[in-house]
Amino acid sequence: MNKRNHIRLPPEVNRLLYVRNLPYKITSDEMYDIFGKFGAIRQIRVGNTPETRGTAFVVYEDIFDAKNACDHLSGFNVCNRYLVVLYYQSNKAFKRVDMDKKQEELNNIKAKYNLKTPEAP
């Protein structure tokens, strides 16, 4: 039986890594050279707009390879820039924005109908 089957990983660990602080001119091939040492990669997307430059997403085939890459490449020096490698958390990225939007909608409804929140006893 494979040893990996018995290892419990933290819930934030997944196959999708978000990489920040990349050199702006880094290519996908260079990213494959750096990240490919840790396992098979399904896809790499390097940011190319003004808002996403210096960032990338790396998708590994295996979650353990992604964990190994995250552990070893966070703080790795590439062209005098230290990489920030994180597990991508889509729910965390949008949860706060979603909550703020819902609160704003609630406040608008209260204002529209002149409602007040009852005070707790």
From Swiss-Prot:
InterPro entries documented for this protein: Nucleotide-bd_a/b_plait_sf, RBD_domain_sf, RRM_dom, RRT5_SRSF_SR, SF3B6_RRM
Chain residue ranges for the region called Interaction with pre-mRNA branch site: 12-25
Protein's gene: Sf3b6
Role: Involved in pre-mRNA splicing as a component of the splicing factor SF3B complex. SF3B complex is required for 'A' complex assembly formed by the stable binding of U2 snRNP to the branchpoint sequence (BPS) in pre-mRNA. Directly contacts the pre-mRNA branch site adenosine for the first catalytic step of splicing. Enters the spliceosome and associates with the pre-mRNA branch site as part of the 17S U2 or, in the case of the minor spliceosome, as part of the 18S U11/U12 snRNP complex, and thus may facilitate the interaction of these snRNP with the branch sites of U2 and U12 respectively.
Span of domain RRM: 15-90
Family: Belongs to the SF3B6 family.
Superkingdom, natural source: Eukaryota
Keyword annotations of the record: mRNA processing, mRNA splicing, Nucleus, RNA-binding
Cellular location(s): Nucleus
GO molecular-function terms, A-Z: mRNA binding
Biological process according to GO: mRNA splicing, via spliceosome
Complex and partners: Component of splicing factor SF3B complex. Component of the U11/U12 snRNPs that are part of the U12-type spliceosome.
Pfam families noted in UniProt: RRM_1 (PF00076)
The UniProt record lists the keyword RNA-binding: yes
Protein name: Splicing factor 3B subunit 6
Protein's organism: Drosophila melanogaster
Cellular component aspect of the GO annotation: catalytic step 2 spliceosome; precatalytic spliceosome
